[in-house]
Amino acid sequence: MLAPLLLGLASTAAANAADRVETVQLPIAQMPGQHVALHCVAPRRPSGKSVLFVHGASFPTMLAAGFAFAPGDSWLAYAAERGYLACGLDFLGFGASSRPAAMLAPPADAPPISAARDAVTQIGIAVAYLRSQRHVTTVHIVAHSWGTIPATAFAARDAGRLASLTLFGPIAHEHAKDDDTPAFGAWWSITARERYEQLRFRQVLPATTVLLEHAVDERWANAFEASAPHVPGDRAGELRIPAGPLADIAAPAAGLASYAAGTVETPVFIVYGNYDTEVDDAGAAALLARFSRSPLKWRLRIDDGSHVMHLETHRRSLYAGVDAFVRAVEATRVADATHRGSSAR
């Protein structure tokens, strides 16, 4: 009787530890009064290693890598349990980050907020914090969807210091553009329930196939609605979302040309589901080929997964695939360092 009780207490303690998400606000020097939020789950003991998660175009960290399907069950918690300081960045205007004044004005009054050129700077702020304040020496970035564009640009700028770059569901398809494509303002809007319905990907999944986890069906839309302030005068449940990411995706040079891949000297992993609407086998192969200076390149397709596989029933395969790549990178780094040391003697 005592053994099951102790086991239950130990499991509860582990879950509670994994749920301790610390959120820090990091100022944006170029924008006085504005800040980005970084959500972190610490490992049991410091390792000097971190995984930084970068979200996509419409919803923030705590609806993505930080979404808890059950106590202690999130991608952040998974990475922390494996010894990494697991952090997720909310870009400006998303989640717990600040909202610039333009998000309270009509969208046509300002250019798109948090476009890739600005998001690169925000990733740099998070990485600088991890290195200087959390004493991290090894940083792996895991980016999703549109977030893979600024993450790649940051990897190119970071001059080989980044340990690895994972591109989950990158934007490898060219989106149709015509003269009727509207110009983007500062922000766009959607209700949480509308975005949830989009996550079901009914247009590409077989009629009887449902991939979303039950916890997403139960809690995701309400959590998304609570993640952003409601602006008086907007319709009930309407969320204002920075338009920079959508403007990047719709730009004439979008698709493969969006990625500053040719100068990246970091190991790269492209992972996606067979039902992903933004990348397929050919697109993933073409994008990976652009990383001509990357010393290690992996590509993985996980069947029965969509563009939001991190919210679906096969998410643990995604977690494990990324973890395997990260550990392969670290093993290679150790082997290379050992070889260099032996050669020097």
For each feature predicted by the language model, list its residue ranges.
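Conserved alpha/beta-hydrolase "acid-adjacent" motif
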Residues: 277-283
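Alpha/beta-hydrolase active-site loop
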Residues: 107-133
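Glycine-rich "HGGG/HGxG" loop immediately N-terminal to the catalytic nucleophile
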Residues: 63, 89-111, 307
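Alpha/beta-hydrolase
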Residues: 176, 180-271
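Catalytic histidine-centered segment of alpha/beta-hydrolase-like enzymes
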Residues: 305-316
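Short, surface-exposed "cap/lid" segments of acyl-processing enzymes
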Residues: 45-88
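Conserved hydrolase catalytic core segment
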Residues: 137-142, 146-175
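N-terminal cap/lid segment of alpha/beta-hydrolase-fold proteins
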Residues: 16-46
